[in-house]
Amino acid sequence: MARLSIAVIFAAASVLLSVTARACPALIEGVPPDRLKALSQGVNADGWIADPRSAPPRSLLRELRKAGLSHIRLPVPADFVMPRFAAKAEIDGRLRSVDAALKTLLELGYSVSIDLHSGERFNALHKDDPPGAMAEMKSAWTGLARVMQRHPYDRVFAELLNEPDVDAAQWQNEVRELAGFIRGLLPQTTLITGPVNWQRADSLPDFTPLDDPNVVYAIHFYDPMVFTHQAHWDPNEPLHDVSGLPYPIRADDPRVQQLREQLTALGKPKTLAMVDRAIPDRGIDQWLEPAAAWQRQYSHPIIINEFGVLKAGAPRDSRLRWLAGVTAYARQQCWGWTHWEMSQGFGLADAVTGKPDREALRALLGTR
C-alpha cells in the first residue's frame, strides 16, 4: 500500500472533525495568557525521574523545542516521593533528579509541569485509607514544592495527581483540600487537575471546578482504545491480539474485515466485540464534546494532557491521522495538548535513530 502524504493526512483530519472553526471560548481571569500559551503544545517525558539514565538526550529536547514544542510534562512516580513507600534518602535522590531535570528543561526554553504520577501502591492506599493517602500527597508536595520554589513560578506548574483512582465524590472532596494545601506552598503557581476515571472527557461533567482561578483542567484521550492501544504490551490484555486496525474504523474497510476474520479464527470473542463496538467510530469531536460542554458551562481552561497511539500495531498513516485530528480539535477549542510520550511505545522519537519523528511532529503541529 502506498504511503499517504502528510498533506492527505491533514486533509483527512479536517474531514474527520465535524465541528466548524469557532472563536476561542471566553475564560475567567486567573491563568495568565503566557502560561496558557506555554501549555499549548508539549510532550510527556515519562521515565526520566523513575530512571534518570533514561533521560532524553539534550539534542532531542533541543530539536523538539526548535520544532515548536513549549511544554514538558514531567511525571514523578508518587511511590518514589512518599515516606510510606520510600526511605528519606531515596526521596531526596528523586527530588534532586526533579531539580536537575527542571534546570535542563528551563535552560532549553521549556515550561514544565510537575505531575505527581500515581502508582499501584499509592492507588491501593488511596482506596483503603483516604486520610493516609492525603497525608502522603501532602508530604510529596511539600518536597516537590521546595524544589519548585528554586525556579521561576511562571514556568513551572503543579499537577496535583495523575488519574485519581477513587470514586468521583471522594476525589472532589480531596482535591479542594489538596489544592488549598499546595496553594499555601506555591502561592503564584498555576495548578493542574482533572477528574477520576482515567481523566476521560466524559468524566469531566461530573467534576466541579475549584474556587481557585489559577487552575488548568486536564483530560486524557485515547479513544477508541481498540485503535490507540492495539498490540498492547500485556499478552493477557485482549488488545494484545489486535494489530493493523486502521483509523477511522469502518465496517467496509478490507483491513477491518480481515482483522475480524483473524480474531474469529483465533477464538477471541472478547477482542472481536471490542472491534465491533468501535464500528462506526464516533469521531474525535464527539468523543471530546463532554469536555467542551463543561468548558462552556464553567469557562475554565482545558488541556489534553495525555493522548497518543501505540506504534507497535497501528498503521502509520492511521496513527498520524488520529494525532492530527486530536490536535486540530484542540486548536479549534483553544486547548493545550501534551503528547504521550517522548521515547517509548507511544514515542515521538524514532526508535531507531532517536531523533524526532518529523511526520508525527508535523501531524501534531498542523504544519507542512
Model-derived features: positions:
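Bacterial N-terminal signal peptides
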Residues: A7-S18
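N-terminal carbohydrate-binding accessory modules
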Residues: A23-R73, K88, W294
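Active-site region of glycoside hydrolase catalytic domains
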Residues: A26, A135-A278, D285, E289-V309, ...
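Acidic (Asp/Glu)-rich catalytic clusters
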Residues: V31-K37, S59-G68, A100-E107, A145-Y153, ...
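A cross-family glycoside hydrolase active-site/sugar-binding cleft signature
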Residues: N44-D46, R73-P77, S113-H117, E159-L161, ...
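Acidic-and-aromatic substrate-binding clefts and catalytic sites of carbohydrate-active enzymes
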Residues: W48-P56, D79-G93, A135, P164-A169, ...
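An active-site-proximal structural segment forming one wall of the substrate-binding cleft
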Residues: R53-P56, L61-S70, V76, E90-L116, ...
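Aromatic-rich peripheral "rim/lid" segments of glycoside hydrolase catalytic domains that contact
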Residues: A312-R368
